Amino acid sequence: MCIRDSSRSVGKIYCAPGNAGIAAQAECVPLKETQIPELVEFAKEHGVDLTVVGPEVPLSAGIADAFTKAGLRIFGPSAAAARIESSKDFAKRLMEKYDIPTASFKTFDNYADAIEYVSRHSFPVVLKYDGLAAGKGVVIPETFSDAQAALKDMLLDDKFGKGKVVVEEYLTGPEFSFMCFVNGEEVFPLAIAQDHKRAFEGDKGPNTGGMGAYSPVPVITAEDEEYTLEHIMRKTAAAMVAEDCPFKGLLYGGLMK
C-alpha cells in the first residue's frame, strides 16, 4: 500500500478482512483470513496478481499451499515451513538438530511430568505454549506456584488450545528482532529492530503481541548482526531446505544477545 501511489504497476489493492483504518487505501473484502477456499476464489475472480499474507494462522493452515495449487502467486511459506513459527517445539528441535544457538529446553504434553521437571529447576524459568497464541503464549514464572498456575492454564485448561508446552532455560540480555526475506537458502536481511512485548512500563506485566518497536538498535553491533545472520538466520534457512520444507517468505527471528 505504501508504494501504490508511486507505482504505475499497482492498479488495485484488496484487504481481507480489512478495517475502517485501511479502507482509504484498499478495498476491504468481507472474508476472514481463515476462509482459504473463498480467498482463493476471490483471487481468481478478481485477477489478483500477488497475495501477501501477514498473520501466522492462515499460513499454518496452508493458505500458501492452496494458492500455489490454484496457480496463484502468494508471498508466504507453506504450512510445513510455517511450523518454524507455529510450533515452538518444531523450531527448538530444528535448532538442536542443526546446531543453531538456542536456550536449552524440554517439551511436555503432560501436566504432572512438566510439574515434576520444573520443580527440580531454579527460577525464573520460561514456559512457552507450543502453538500460536497471538504473542501471549510465553510466561516467565518467578516462583514454583506461578509455574503451577501457568502450566495448569496451558496443559489442563487448554487456555490457548490443546497442545504442548516447551520449558526453556531463562536467559538474560537485550532482546532484538531480525527479519529476513528468505527464498530457500537465499537470505536477504532487513534492519534489526527491538520490540516491547510486556504490557506495562519498565518491561513489566504479561507478554502481548507487541506494544511498540524501534530501529536501529544501538546495543546490537555490526558484529552481532553479522554473527546472527550467518549462524542463525542462514543456518535456519539451510536447515529448512535440508528438512524438505524450504521457507519462502519473511522469516522472523526473536533473539537475545
Model-predicted segments: where are they?
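ATP-binding N-terminal substructure of ATP-dependent carboxylate-amine bond-forming enzymes
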Residues: M1-A79, A112
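General beta-strand structural signal in soluble alpha/beta enzymes
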Residues: C15-A16, V52-V53, I74-P77, S104-T107, ...
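Short, charged, surface-exposed secondary-structure boundary motifs
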Residues: A24-Q25, V40, R83-D89, F200-G202
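Glycine-rich phosphate-binding loop signature in dinucleotide/nucleotide-binding domains
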Residues: A43-V48, R120-H121, G161
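A conserved helix-loop-beta module that forms one wall/lid of the active-site cleft
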Residues: F75-G137
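Internal nucleotide-binding/catalytic subdomain
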Residues: I140-K257
